[in-house]
Swiss-Prot record:
Assembly and interaction partners: The complex is composed of two ATP-binding proteins (UgpC), two transmembrane proteins (UgpA and UgpE) and a solute-binding protein (UgpB).
Entry's Gene Ontology cellular component terms: outer membrane-bounded periplasmic space
Taxonomic lineage: Bacteria, Pseudomonadati, Pseudomonadota, Gammaproteobacteria, Enterobacterales
Major subcellular location class: periplasm
Protein name: sn-glycerol-3-phosphate-binding periplasmic protein UgpB
Organism encoding this protein: Salmonella paratyphi A (strain ATCC 9150 / SARB42)
Signal sequence residues: 1-23
Amino acids binding sn-glycerol 3-phosphate: Y65, E89, S144, S270, G307, Y346, R397
Length: 438
């Protein structure tokens, strides 16, 4: 009889523990953070899971930004979307127009969490804010601006001041020639050429990229990056390329690897590349602001953000959304947002995270770590330098890559390439405009 009682009690306890295990709400989080960045994403998720045993954030690397966005949309159509999808900034208009999302402000409201949207840096939050409601549609996460990384040891060898990176594109062209003369095979390379050499070149020099304030004022915007200033800039890079001073090594982050391997003396890349550079560079390096065009009056203006935000997908259970809200709230806590900023090089997305980082003395100990923030806040943004909100922008970036590659291979002049990119890109904008009105 006692044995039967023990058996029954053991069975009851087993079922109870099984019930507790089954009660854990699993929350898939698809992202594009690899290398050191991916490790930090995993670390944040693990700490949240330990503090919130009823929920389990499961980060899944789904490839680069384009691949992750495509995978997320395809999964939504089949009813298998993750709860959280990281989408890069140029996918914002696409996500806004889709019926696949649940706005983050609604997620917090439904979860009963009093979430202060004003804590986010305004120039970052504005990129992801709905103009009609004034609320965030997605939560800023890994926001960045392009910065200039340079090899201080190579500078010394070339007779250049290692504490003075080039401030203008004209200076950069001069520096690359000297670096090459001193033995560097690659003086300068650039990743993400559309984002850096056209989108941010335009904003940093106070030029529009598209009409309608870069699309923020309507879907009937047209591209405008084939103006004399942009053409002149691409012509400068073309001339450097012909001399061997500028090396085109790929559309994404390939130039960062070329830099930290010591092959290229300088590169313009995301501030978020700092984590990998810090890990792999075996030489002294520095961080400088993006160069500006010395011939453009009023430059530099302000940088526009890159990186990505976190979107919440439709069609999930209430308990899943509660867990998502708690996780997003966790990410925005000053200590967590500050740690993410310090370990990765991405911008501090909240004012409190920036202040905490400053109080901790991080910027004093790590000169250049605040470059991305200083660029973004260099001057109050003009209506057409606060960012981009253009439909089909990922595909437009591909077009820009194709056309710029035709310049580097000598098949087109800078004017021909940018004219064609604008023409092809405008066709995609008209398709998006038509679809958004249907």
């Amino acid at each position: 009889m006692i044995s039967l009682r023990h058996t029954a009690l053991g069975l009851a306890l087993s079922l109870a523990f099984t019930g507790q295990a089954l009660a854990v709400t699993t929350i898939p989080f698809w992202h594009s953070m690899e290398g050191e960045l991916g490790k930090e994403v995993d670390s944040l998720a693990q700490r949240f899971n330990q503090a919130n045993p009823d929920y389990k954030i499961v980060p899944v690397y789904k490839g680069n930004y384009e691949q992750n966005l495509s995978a997320g949309i395809a999964a939504f159509r089949t009813g298998n979307a993750p709860a959280i999808l990281q989408v890069y900034e140029v996918g914002t208009a696409t996500m806004m127009a889709s019926k696949a999302i649940k706005p983050v402000y609604e997620v917090f409201k439904d979860a009963g969490i009093n979430f202060d949207e004003s804590q986010f840096v305004p120039t970052v939050a504005g990129y992801y804010t709905d103009a009609k409601s004034g609320h965030l549609l997605s939560q800023p996460f890994n926001s960045s601006t392009p910065v200039l990384y340079y090899n201080k040891d190579a500078f010394k060898k070339a007779g250049l001041d290692p504490e003075q990176p080039p401030k203008t594109w004209q200076e950069l062209a001069d520096y690359t020639a000297k670096l090459r003369a001193a033995g560097m095979k690659c003086g300068y390379a650039s990743g993400w050429q559309g984002w850096i050499q056209l989108e941010n070149f335009s904003a940093w020099n106070g030029l529009p990229f598209a009409s309608k304030n870069n699309g923020f004022d309507g879907t009937d915007a047209v591209l405008e990056f084939n103006k004399p200033e942009q053409v002149k800039h691409i012509a400068l890079l073309e001339e450097m390329n012909k001399k061997g001073d500028f090396s085109y090594v790929g559309r994404k982050d390939e130039s960062t690897e070329k830099f930290y391997n010591g092959d290229c003396a300088m590169t313009t890349a995301s501030s978020g590349s700092l984590a990998n550079i810090r890990q792999y560079a075996k030489f002294n390096y520095g961080v400088g602001m993006m160069p500006y065009d010395a011939d453009i009056k009023g430059a530099p203006q302000n940088a526009i953000i890159g990186g990505a935000s976190l979107w919440v997908m439709q069609g999930k259970y209430k308990e899943t959304y509660t867990g998502v809200a708690k996780f997003l709230d966790f990410l925005a806590k000053p200590e967590n947002a500050a740690e993410w900023h310090q370990k990765t090089g991405y911008l501090p997305i909240t004012t409190a995270a920036y202040e905490l980082t400053r109080e901790q003395g991080y910027y004093d100990k790590n000169p250049g770590a605040d470059i991305a923030t200083r660029q973004m806040l260099n001057k109050p943004p003009l209506p057409f330098t606060k960012g981009l909100r253009l439909g089909n922008m990922p595909q437009i970036r591909t077009i820009v890559d194709e056309e710029l590659e035709s310049v580097w291979t000598g098949k087109k002049t800078p004017q021909q390439a940018l004219d064609t990119a604008v023409e092809r890109g405008n066709q995609l904008l008209r398709r998006f405009e038509k679809a958004s009105k249907s």
